[in-house]
Amino acid sequence: MKKKEKKDYIFSRLDAVLKPEGYKSFKTGGDPTYVLNSDDMAVYFFMNFKDMGYVTFSSLYISIHIVENILHSFCPYDDSVIDKKKYFPDTIYDRNIKVIEGYRRGIGYDIEEKSQLEEFTDWVIDYLENDGKQFIETYSYLPNVLKRMDELTIEGKVWQNNEVGILSGALDAQLRGLIIAKLCNDN
């Protein structure tokens, strides 16, 4: 299948589900992105359509604006990259997504036939309507993020652990965590 056919099919299905929810799509560039932005946060995900046939799906990111604004006030990022339309600094990231059989993390899902395209798209939509929606509902509330951070600490894991963590970033994740704790009046 051609890359354009894959994009057309996936975007038409995603648009039907996400546009009524208020998502905006940015379908140009190497990382087509869907964004739901509000006064408090931006929820987004992106995809990559690779020349070798693979399609990747990022799972959900949430940028909690108050956290990122505080962090940005003393730890600036490159404003030319973070445009707050398509690109946001990410506060949290859903690392616990259940991937479809045949999906290779970091590489994607190889789509050569219509049935594979349908299966991949169904998986993305199912995630967005179920586990993804639950992720947004749970972690758009800062005390729930703090609770997960506390659980990770008890388990001896860093907040941005690659397999089960909740916060995005590297060293800046620690700053995000401290900001979240302070906003939740945690000592």
Task: Label each region the model flagged.
Residues 2-7, 35-187:
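Intrinsically disordered, low-complexity regulatory regions enriched in serine/threonine/proline
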Residues 3-27:
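Amphipathic alpha-helical segments
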Residues 26-34:
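Long, charged, glycine-rich C-terminal linkers/tails
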